[in-house]
Amino acid sequence: MRPILIGVAGGTGSGKTTVANNVLEQVGTEHIAYIPHDAYYRDLSHLKPDMRAKVNFDHPDSLESELLVEHLKQLRMGRAVEIPVYDFTTHTRTDETERVEPAPVVLVEGILVFVEPELREIFDIKLYIDTDADVRFIRRLMRDIRQRGRSVEAVCEQYLSTVRPMHLEFVEPSKRYADVIIPEGGFNEVAIEMVAARIRGMLEERAE
């Protein structure tokens, strides 16, 4: 059975991961393979640490999306893939990989998954999580400080220099490609339940 490929996009801190986790919970983790686009950031080990921090991580070129497309094609053919494991504190790929087995549903989440045409067009369902900019910034600030060892000053500087401009140039315009736009992210239980019900229905149809 050909898997259902789902893309979940939206600005940084919009609630993409929360929505993805809620869908996973409602549909059943045994039915879904989850892949974060963040895992495909390009390895910057060839750069000095101070130069790595200056890279624009919110530009499509910072991600190896062509590798993700290849992995999705492999999963669609029923083959397992080894996805990269990225270290956000050093901005490098580790020597480890994470094995993702084929599943009836493959869910990919990331801010730029609708920007590259080849990646965007591979999805059967495209969801865009739409959340106010101030809420997204606060969430990103808290995440980067707690999980990625960043300072308040560094997060604010990055937000103003690259995150916000790239959101306006790439992320926000990609919303027009979405099949469903979900306001307020993980707090929109009705929308999440509707999406989960649709996925369950598609799985039942394909099982017949």
Residue ranges and their predicted role:
Residues 12:
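The conserved Walker
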Residues 33, 42-90:
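Conserved nucleotide-sensing/catalytic segment adjacent to the nucleotide-binding pocket
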Residues 71-108, 113-114, 200, 206:
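Phosphate-binding/switch loop-helix module in NTP-utilizing enzymes
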Residues 25-33:
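Post-Walker A helix-loop "phosphate-sensing" segment adjacent to the P-loop in P-loop NTPases
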Residues 16:
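Conserved lysine of the Walker
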Residues 94-148:
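ATP-dependent NMP and nucleoside kinases share a basic, alpha-helical "lid"
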Residues 101-102, 142-145, 164-208:
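NTP-dependent small-molecule kinase module
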Residues 19:
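Hydrophobic positions on the alpha1 helix immediately C-terminal to the Walker A/P-loop
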